[in-house]
Amino acid sequence: MNRIVVLIFATLSMFSLVAQEKVSHKPFDEILQKYVDETGLVNYKGIGQERAKLKSYLKVLEENFPKDSWSDDEKLAYWINAYNAYTIDLILEHYPVKSIKDIGAKIKIPFVNTPWDIKFIKIDGEEMDLNNIEHGIIRKQFDEPRIHFALVCAAISCPKLQNKAYFPETLDAQLSDAAKDFLTDETKNEFVSTKKAYLSMLFNWYRGDFTKETSLEEYLNKYSDVQLEKRARIGFKDYDWALNEQK
């Protein structure tokens, strides 16, 4: 009898552990579908009215952090959604703002000069900031340049915020779609001809991420409608830090 009880307890514990490891991104997906339009602009006032739902999702992220048993796609989807959800939450915490960079001017924390350095995130008991997620985790652990088209820093010149969350089972296709969306948006990247282009500053800031195995032109040609020639003349567009908000 005791052996049966022990077996049942062990089985329930196993199922409990599996349940804890599963994170549903559906609540965030519902928020994005409701408050982000097709161009990626955000209704921050609307999300603010349902901030409890966003906070509930963030609580799930805090308590169900990636485990070694997770697949790479499960981990990466988690961290991309976490970055975007926490960025929205940061905007709401200081709303109204004209730019996310205005938050850096508002805060009075020693040695913290930008909104990306504010330790307002707590995952697995560890305090972290948006830079920790992007540079310390995502760029460090995943050799995936397309993340630059998925992480959205709440600015007009950032890649558009997709009106859906990222899910492990569709992650590869979603990242490719985000890359194509970004490179075919003439306000972000202007391909004048096969010999000349004005690109987003993202390709200047993170050029090394895109050129580990190929040239920048060859990387762009995988997702752009215009095929750049080798040694094309490339310039970089000014970055618009205005808030990506619906008017």
What are these regions (language model features)?
Residues 1-21:
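Bacterial Sec-dependent N-terminal signal peptides
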Residues 21-247:
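Interaction/scaffold regions that mediate signaling and macromolecular assembly across diverse proteins
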